[in-house]
Amino acid sequence: MLSARNRMRRSTEFDATVRQGVRTVQPDVIVHVRRAKECAADSSPRVGLIIAKSVGTAVERHRVARRLRHVARPMLMNLHPCDRVVIRALPSSRHVSSAWLEQQLRSGLRRAFESAGADR
């Protein structure tokens, strides 16, 4: 699971990442990546999840969120401390395995950083 310091909680962070960040679309997730212009010395990368009701029932949405948090955690060490990532789950994400979600998330992050021209 993600620690509290690695979770996005404020809507302003979500909005800035989604609106100003680089977006990559995968079959089951959309990944938004943004490097914050200002970050404190003790800052760490933050990840936020968007799981819409279209994904399924509350139980299915929670299951997808748990899977995404689980696969996002090991990727934190590859991110810059100022990086902000929002993962939007698409309805088809409830039918796929965690391994497939991890592969899509890795691919989405790689493509987003290539598009942004940022080093990791």
Curated annotation (Swiss-Prot):
Domain of life: Bacteria
InterPro entries from the UniProt entry: Ribosomal_Su5_D2-typ_SF, Ribsml_uS5_D2-typ_fold_subgr, RNase_P, RNase_P_CS
Sorted UniProt keywords: Endonuclease, Hydrolase, Nuclease, RNA-binding, tRNA processing
Reactions catalysed according to its record: Endonucleolytic cleavage of RNA, removing 5'-extranucleotides from tRNA precursor
A biological process term (GO) from this entry: tRNA 5'-leader removal
One Gene Ontology term of the molecular function aspect: 3'-tRNA processing endoribonuclease activity
S-S bridge residues: none
Pfam families attached to this UniProt entry: Ribonuclease_P
GO cellular component annotations of the record: ribonuclease P complex
EC number: 3.1.26.5
Subunit organization: Consists of a catalytic RNA component (M1 or rnpB) and a protein subunit.
HAMAP family: RNase_P (MF_00227)
Record-stated family: Belongs to the RnpA family.
Role description: RNaseP catalyzes the removal of the 5'-leader sequence from pre-tRNA to produce the mature 5'-terminus. It can also cleave other RNA substrates such as 4.5S RNA. The protein component plays an auxiliary but essential role in vivo by binding to the 5'-leader sequence and broadening the substrate specificity of the ribozyme.
The protein's name in its UniProt record: Ribonuclease P protein component
Species, as recorded: Mycobacterium marinum (strain ATCC BAA-535 / M)
